[in-house]
Amino acid sequence: ENFAGGCIPGYMRTADGRCKPTY
């Protein structure tokens, strides 16, 4: 599934619009 923001699986969207790993 694709999330808004287009981060790869295992990553989340941060408040500044970037992607960071959730681990």
From Swiss-Prot:
Keyword Transmembrane helix set for record: no
Tissue specificity as recorded in UniProt: Hemolymph.
Keyword Metal-binding carried by entry: no
Keywords: Cytokine
UniProt cross-references to Pfam families, sorted A to Z: GBP_PSP
GO cellular component, one term: extracellular space
GO molecular function terms listed in the Swiss-Prot or TrEMBL record: cytokine activity
Family from the record: Belongs to the GBP/PSP1/paralytic peptide family.
Function: Causes rapid, rigid paralysis when injected into Lepidopteran larvae. The physiological role may be to reduce hemolymph loss following injury and promote wound healing.
Name recorded for this polypeptide: Paralytic peptide 2
Organism name: Heliothis virescens
